[in-house]
């Protein structure tokens, strides 16, 4: 979420939704969450299991943090209990060296969207919680 631009876009696109963000250093944000009434930002390590206590049930999560598979999977494991049935969890920028491991995990559908920006790290791991 670095810089906060993605949260700002989501806040504008979905003004009736509650948008929650997590960053390890909120001083890096280039937006002021006080200007967005539907936005709440937490400062924490993405692998901190206590963050779950601060969150409501969630319908959509996009994780674009450290880009390291162990961190991403740890975050998924922490947040998965907070996903409503049918909720979607997207891990962005899955590096090519982790592609096979996510596929082997079996919970994620994999999408290669490198054609969108012609960037090597534009691969998504997408989980949909069963109804």
Regions found by a protein language model. Name each.
Residues 1-51:
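SAM cofactor-binding core of SAM-dependent methyltransferases
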Residues 7, 55, 72-76:
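Conserved strand-to-helix beginnings and helix N-cap segments that scaffold or border functional pockets
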Residues 14-15, 56, 84:
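Short conserved AdoMet
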Residues 22, 62-63, 91-93:
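Active-site flanking residues adjacent to catalytic metal/cofactor-binding acidic residues
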Residues 32-35, 51-56, 102-106:
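Alpha-helix C-terminal capping segments
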Residues 40-43, 60, 71:
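Nucleotide-sugar donor-binding/catalytic module of glycosyltransferases
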Residues 52-68:
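A short acidic, Gly/Pro-enriched loop at the edge of an enzyme's catalytic core
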Residues 67-131:
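C-terminal substrate-binding/active-site "lid" region of AdoMet-derived donor-dependent transferases
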């Amino acid at each position: 979420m670095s810089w906060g631009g993605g949260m700002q876009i989501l806040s504008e696109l979905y003004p009736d939704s509650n948008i929650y963000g997590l960053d390890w250093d909120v001083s890096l944000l280039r937006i002021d969450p006080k200007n967005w009434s539907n936005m709440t930002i937490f400062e924490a390590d993405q692998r901190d299991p206590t963050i779950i206590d601060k969150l409501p049930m969630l319908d959509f999560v996009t994780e674009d943090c450290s880009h390291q598979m162990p961190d991403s999977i740890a975050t998924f494991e922490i947040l998965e209990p907070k996903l409503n049935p049918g909720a979607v969890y997207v891990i962005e920028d899955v590096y090519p060296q982790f592609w096979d491991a996510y596929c082997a995990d079996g919970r994620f559908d994999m999408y290669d969207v490198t054609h969108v920006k012609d960037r090597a790290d534009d691969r998504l791991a997408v989980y949909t919680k069963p109804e």
